[in-house]
Amino acid sequence: MKEEFKKKEMSEKIIMLLESSCKDFKGIKTAYAEACAELRSKFEYTDRIIEYNNCIAAYETELAFEQGIKDNLNYFNNPNKILSDAHYSVLENIIRQKTKSIITERQKLVKLLPASLIPAYDAVIEYTVFLDTYIPKLAHYYGFVYGNKNNYNPDSEVCKKYREWLSTYLGIEPEGENNALL
């Protein structure tokens, strides 16, 4: 893979796409920021939890992007193969294995949260779950499309169907005017 791909940058760009394209995300992100501010003032490990969450998002982006490229090549070599939701199950397993230790460390800190801060932490969970849902799917799609640039005749119809499915599934346009990822 080319050096130009930087996992943290791409996860930040996906978050920017969500901010501009997904009506639900703005409220979730605002609640997350407010919860983080409250948690920071009352819980000393908040910044470490946030860093773990950012690290997980970056790994999700990197792994999904790479898997998208691999799936594109696999599709190129086996054009009768159909892209399906099963790709995401495989991807989720890969991500789970790679982020397991980070999640374990984060959970150790979360267990230290005083009961009075659990309601504030719920907004952190909602934000994290939102990213866990959107980032791998979008990054996989971008990897799949990026794989078309590897000097072969891409099947643009498959990419179009993938984009249409993803747009319907996530409720956003992955190649919209605010998207600087492709």
Q: Could you tell me what each predicted segment is?
A:
Residues 1-177:
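Intrinsic-disorder/low-complexity detector
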Residues 181-182:
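Hydrophobic/aromatic hotspots within intrinsically disordered, low-complexity regions
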